Every structure is written in structure tokens, then in C-alpha cells.
Amino acid sequence: MVKAAVLYEVGSQLVIEDVELDDPQAGEVLVKVGAAGICRSDRHFMHGDAPIALPVVLGHEGAGTVEAVGPGVTSVKPGDQVFLSFVPSCGRCKSCITGNSHLCDNHGATGPNMYDGTTRLHKGDQRIHHMGKTACFAEHAVVPET
């Protein structure tokens, strides 16, 4: 269980509560969140100015410490300090391998779930979405390696 700030409905306050966080899967990393920025984007989602799947843990700018890695993760290890961003990069396309990860051919996959279409956050049977695959308005976050 981790504490997280969950948005259940547009126009409402964030609810700070315990939620379940699954272990990282292949290509994923568990991060203990040390800091999270509050961005105008978070407010847009909260106020309904932009659509988002609910319920959701917001927060797409953060920093923390890697606590665990899933199978196949090679770029970070437990104890590493990392920055969390909602602009994911695949690390494999031409843009990524030439140092232009901000132009990633696959970055359009910034939806509310992990790359496999599931979530790592839930409360009982109710899944909770990850804003931009980061969801750093929580004590811990499971994020893609890249």
C-alpha cells in the first residue's frame, strides 16, 4: 500500500488515501518519489479543461530513488536517482538512438495506462490510471524504464 492523491471526478478535490501498487513488470521501475511538481496540466485535468481517464493519480513531473526494477531493465538500478517525465521515449527508434528522445517516434503512447494497457495502481478491483505513465502524486510510482 502507498499513499496517493487520487482524482475520482472532475471538479473535485484530490483524495489522499492508501492504494495498492503492483510490482514492476518487464521494462518497468519502482521509484520512491522524493518530489513532485504541480503543473498547470494537473489543474487542467482536475477542472475538466482536458479529458483524462478516471480515477487517476496525477503528477507527471517528479524525482526520486529507484527501489526495484522489473525484468530486462538495464539503464537503472536500485539506489539510482531519477527524474520522472510524462514525455516517455522508447530508447529504440531512430530519434532515441541519435540522442533526440524528445522526438521519439513512439512517444504518442502517453495514455493513462502502462504500455501493456494495464495499470499498476488499484484499490481492490478498481483500477486507478497513471497520468502520463508517471503518477508521481504518490509515495511510490511504477514507471517505464525509458
Predicted regions and their residues:
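Extreme N-terminal starter segment of soluble prokaryotic enzymes
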Residues: 1-3
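Short loop segments at secondary-structure junctions
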Residues: 10-11, 67-72, 146
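Short N-terminal binding/cap micro-motifs at the start of the first secondary-structure element
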Residues: 12-16, 40-41
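Short Gly/Pro-enriched turn/cap motifs at secondary-structure boundaries
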Residues: 20-21, 53-59, 128-133, 139
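Glycine-rich beta-strand-centered segment in the early N-terminal region that forms part
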Residues: 22-36, 46-97, 102, 110
